[in-house]
Amino acid sequence: MAQKEGGRTVPCCSRPKVAALTAGTLLLLTAIGAASWAIVAVLLRSDQEPLYPVQVSSADARLMVFDKTEGTWRLLCSSRSNARVAGLSCEEMGFLRALTHSELDVRTAGANGTSGFFCVDEGRLPHTQRLLEVISVCDCPRGRFLAAICQDCGRRKLPVDRIVGGRDTSLGRWPWQVSLRYDGAHLCGGSLLSGDWVLTAAHCFPERNRVLSRWRVFAGAVAQASPHGLQLGVQAVVYHGGYLPFRDPNSEENSNDIALVHLSSPLPLTEYIQPVCLPAAGQALVDGKICTVTGWGNTQYYGQQAGVLQEARVPIISNDVCNGADFYGNQIKPKMFCAGYPEGGIDACQGDSGGPFVCEDSISRTPRWRLCGIVSWGTGCALAQKPGVYTKVSDFREWIFQAIKTHSEASGMVTQL
């Protein structure tokens, strides 16, 4: 169990506090149960989680949008803006990008359970980040509709055993987890969004750690000493311009603790290296949902880093509770959230920062893991009423998409608001 004497609140990486998990006894798992996701617009199913209102067919890649007024699924009528619509649709579902798109004809491909069409308002399309805001029911006289293949994410390629809390994990279980190393030493965790982009915490890159040629990204292994993992260099780091400690070293405001790392070349996607999904647009966390945090950080506050990747399941705590006087006393801002047990015992610690907090759902029919949080900061490790604090990824979806599109050719340290 991670322990700390005293109560100073510090970033998880204050001496690079990067994602590592502390072992402890899991209590209350059964009592807490698995809470469901709250979705802005959904199709309720009696036996499963709500479906997200934008779907892509696994059979022929057709895009389908739910008409909540009529209670039916509709196809997207093909237009001159198919590339933009395909990309926006994939992003809305939590995929990083559309890989390809095409047209299908309803007369030959069939309706396959859908009923009618939506058309896109192409004039409004450049000014929106939500497909649902720019579509309306239409006739689609040509009967041609849009299909898209989104970059796959959030799925393991190997069968794995279930492990509960604060223990060594197995190869391929969390294939999006990477280690960010500076001069060969593990400093932070990170999550693969694609073969060449990693999402992590901004505080992993203070002034003293900004020589990019000294950074390496290690992937495809669970043991830090494994000879089988892959290491790649870093081309650029894009960090949030609103992360105040980079402007004022005395600032204790930890909002906007998020950064993207662009690799010097793409990692090959294998059974052990896979990207994680982002939250879908409008998808919100529900208090009490039990999710998983992983990392190689310290197993105790004053202890050593874990040699093998650790994992632990912890519940999300409401911001109202976490801002209470006995917890963090109004330090939890809207773009943060807490996760852990009030009694402590299981938590992220130094060496865990920047690492993934992931939750599984079935809102896209296929079960997928989504990156809901980034290990950010906390008081000590695994202390009672001092749970880990995470950057809320759902509030940074548009920042992520824009940063990747804007800075794909950049090099060095780059800032983006």
Curated annotation (Swiss-Prot):
Cytoplasmic side: 1-23
Record topological domains on the Extracellular side: 45-417
Example GO biological process: cochlea morphogenesis
SUPFAM superfamilies reported for this sequence: SRCR-like, Trypsin-like serine proteases
Pfam families: Hepsin-SRCR, Trypsin
Major localisation: membrane
Superkingdom: Eukaryota
Residue stretches spanning the membrane: 24-44
Topology class, membrane: Single-pass type II membrane protein
Entry EC no(s): 3.4.21.106
Sites carrying sugar chains: N112
Keyword Ribonucleoprotein: no
Active site: H203, D257, S353
PROSITE patterns linked: TRYPSIN_DOM, TRYPSIN_HIS, TRYPSIN_SER
UniProt function note: Serine protease that cleaves extracellular substrates, and contributes to the proteolytic processing of growth factors, such as HGF and MST1/HGFL. Plays a role in cell growth and maintenance of cell morphology. Plays a role in the proteolytic processing of ACE2. Mediates the proteolytic cleavage of urinary UMOD that is required for UMOD polymerization.
Name this polypeptide is given: Serine protease hepsin
